[in-house]
Amino acid sequence: NKLELLKWIREEKKCEWDVGTINAAVGQGNLEMVKYCVANECPINWSACGCAASGGRLEILKYLREEAKAPWGSWTATRAASNGHLHILEYLVERKFDEYEEDACENAAKNGHLDCLKYLHETAKAPWDYWCVQEAHKNKHTKCVQYLLDNDCPLPDGWRYEHGELHVLVESESESSSESEPESSSDYSLF
């Protein structure tokens, strides 16, 4: 039993612990171990809620927020979106979470989680930026790209969306995207 081992290490061997201890318990999905850490004043910060969100561990996230009063931050939504945990995003909205950053939408788009992307944009009112389109396109998540385009997500410099077609700047190996300017229509590829 991992909880018994943790108790032995702390109580018998008097080993130190830090936020990594509770994060490891959260990552394993071991609620009893998390409760032990909280009851015995293990250091905790915003990363514990992020770890719970990353693994889709709603019961642990609820315990951390509602019982342990653990802090959370934008990383909580970002990790949930990155791994497609819509139920975590729904919980965040229910709890009036308001610390969304562009990374949440970007990670949902990057990993093809259209349901999370839609929920973040339409319900959570999370911000987004051109990275969403760029990452969804790069990873060939066409449904996410189309949703972003249909909802006026900003485009990367040099990209265009006209008459239902996405024109993507093809970057040469010797130029960075911030320096390259299209010289002709051959500098674009169509999505």
What name fits each language-model region?
Residues 1-9:
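Short intrinsically disordered, low-complexity coil segments enriched in acidic
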Residues 4-5, 32-33, 59-60, 87-88, ...:
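Conserved ankyrin/ankyrin-like repeat signature
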Residues 130-173:
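Leucine-rich solenoid repeat scaffolds
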Residues 8-15, 35-43, 62-70, 90-98, ...:
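Ankyrin repeat domain, specifically the short helix-to-loop turn at the C-terminus of the second helix
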